[in-house]
Amino acid sequence: GYANMSEYRLNGAWSADTGSLASGDTVWTGSGWTGQPLMMKWPKEVKAHMNMTEEAKADDDLVEVIYACMDGNVYFLNLKTGEKTRDPLYLGYTFKGAGALDPRGYPIMYVGAGYNSDEGTARVFVINLLDCSVLYTFGNNDEFSLRGSLSFFDGSALVDAETDTLIYPG
């Protein structure tokens, strides 16, 4: 939609600190230039099974901000307050691009590393958001890649719910 915003000014409601990730001679900080936070209002039935704080589970209006950053962490925050909804998930790779949530409502996140790290070659992570466990990884050794060993995932995944297809260009 459209709105007349000529008299309105944006003000920061809160901010969240991130760390840094060193890999070789490089240090990554902040969030990537294509990185956008994901936001989700989880159904109460789903939140009951998630590893969220009790306050987050009890908040019927909670919109969770999920933000993969260049320090190797995925952060989980309350959109209204900026408070943590759960502990950060450390994956050890820099994330420059936005992740994606499964459009069918499954608590699954797809996020790809934007650069290699001391942990190994960049790859895509499929994350179970009930307990923040890694369900699957792929893309780190793509024999069909035209870019050789450059398996960086700076974009965002697309999930076609109708055909149960994941598209994640690297």
Language-model features, listed with the residues they occupy:
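Noncatalytic, solvent-exposed loop/strand surfaces
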Residues: 1-170
